[in-house]
A protein has these predicted regions:
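Feature captures the catalytic ectodomains and active-site-proximal regions of enzymes
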Residues: 5, 16, 22, 28-433
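As written
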Residues: 9-15
Length: 433
């Protein structure tokens, strides 16, 4: 009855409490709750997934549209996170096989539909349309809109950092969109800001677009592309800012600049850390060990976010009456199966897509674009083509084949065709003020 006793007990992290008069069933439930919780949760989660497994398998065996693919990917991600928490490794392996089958079917779906989509026929929301369709409608002169593009953020990584963000923000729309191909920053993110497809960007801005073989940064003109896009969309008179964060020190400086951004109609912030993390995992042994699989990769993302300037930036935005759009340019996939490719020295280095001439490859491993201009992709010469790796494959040259197979196996790569790379989050939120 003493409130102070209860407060002190709860503050001391007691496991549970019983209210007199105590019944035997209360004692049994309290013991079960504290001793058997993990086992009971694991059993219930496993049972629920086994039921859902059949539903997902039936869906995969049918002909699905783009919205159904989004739902399947959401479900697979949900169960991946749930089973990870429950710790049932045997069921996690079954889910892994189901995801592999889903990616195999998704690859066929993309091969059959991508060219129509890129021409605007029955297309899902894609990279080059998100500013026009999802950002500009929120812009006003009385309330700032923030667009945060976290490079290389997969849907599962979003679900991991989401609970922390929702302490200060309310979700208005939790949506997916489809990245263009290649699922690489120079193509996808330039398309986002310019509101055009790559060959259209090259035509409009020949001095600003860089092809794979060109030296120098490939995303150096995003601000110019953004402002040109806003001008074409009738928002040229609106105040807009663009900020790219590529290191910790600059991120901390941006935290202090957020209060001054509230008078702008649109503030775009590009955050590069997650992309650097995936590339570092290939190059650095210590990162390889920290992020050995998807679960560890998610854990590393959560740890980074909790201690990053991005979290502080969001805390500052939360103090304003503002709209917030969080999205990304593409995802990434853990690659495990090598596919041999032969090409001349001008072929690009990416392991998930190749462009060039005189390419030799196994046709069943790739989505090939023999006429890239039909897919709005720039070409180096008239005989250039693009190929994209399917599922969790990665391209390896014939020279030093075994050495490179071993080096790149179980690393995170992007540029190809998979659900993880192409189906990506775009979340519309508002502050809780």
């Amino acid at each position: 009855e003493e409130e102070s006793i209860m407060e002190e007990a709860i503050g001391s992290k007691i496991a549970d409490y019983l209210i007199k008069p105590v019944k035997p069933s209360q004692i049994l439930l309290a013991i079960k709750k504290n001793i058997d919780t993990n086992r009971l949760v694991e059993e219930k989660t496993t049972s629920d997934y086994q039921q859902e497994f059949r539903n997902i398998s039936m869906k995969l065996a049918s002909s699905m549209n783009k919205e159904e693919w989004y739902e399947i990917f959401k479900k697979l991600t949900y169960w991946e996170l749930e089973l990870e928490r429950s710790g049932d490794e045997s069921v996690e392996q079954i889910l892994g096989m189901q995801k592999t089958e889903a990616n195999s079917q998704f690859f066929r779906f993309i091969k059959n539909n991508y060219q129509d989509w890129i021409k605007g026929e029955n297309a899902p929301l894609m990279s080059h349309n998100i500013i026009r369709k999802k950002v500009v409608p929120h812009m006003s002169e009385t309330k700032p809109t923030y667009m945060i593009v976290i490079d290389n953020l997969r849907y599962d990584q979003w679900k991991i950092i989401e609970p922390s963000i929702l302490k200060d923000f309310e979700v208005l729309k939790d949506e997916m969109y489809t990245s263009i191909l290649p699922t690489a920053t120079q193509y996808a993110r330039n398309a986002i800001f310019c509101g055009m497809l790559p060959s259209e960007i090259q035509k409009r801005f020949p001095d600003m677009w860089k092809n794979d073989e060109d030296e120098g940064g490939k995303n150096m003109f995003e601000e110019e592309f953004l402002l040109d896009n806003l001008q074409r969309l009738g928002k040229g008179g609106s105040k807009a800012s663009y900020t790219k964060i590529t290191n910790l020190d600059f991120g901390r400086k941006v935290v202090n600049k957020i209060p001054n951004m509230k008078t702008n109609s649109l503030n775009v912030i590009v955050y590069n850390f997650v992309d650097m993390l995936s590339h570092a995992r290939t190059d650095m042994k210590v990162i390889k060990e920290l992020a050995d699989d998807d679960a560890a990769y998610r854990s590393l993302t959560a740890s980074w976010f909790d201690h990053s300037p991005l979290k502080d930036i969001l805390k500052q935005i939360a103090k304003q009456d503002a709209n917030l759009i969080i999205t990304t340019d593409h995802g990434t996939i853990n690659v495990n199966k090598p596919s041999k490719v032969i090409g001349d020295r001008n072929v690009n280095a990416n392991l998930r897509y190749k462009q060039g001439r005189n390419l030799n490859y196994k046709k069943s491993d790739v989505f090939e674009m023999e006429k890239p201009l039909d897919f709005y992709l720039p070409i180096q010469n008239v005989s250039s083509k693009y190929i994209f790796a399917k599922e969790d494959m990665y391209f390896v040259y014939q020279n030093n084949y075994n050495q490179f197979v071993k080096f790149y196996k179980n690393t995170y790569q992007h540029g190809g065709v998979s659900m993880e790379e192409m189906i990506i989050p775009i979340i519309t939120l508002k502050t809780k003020l």
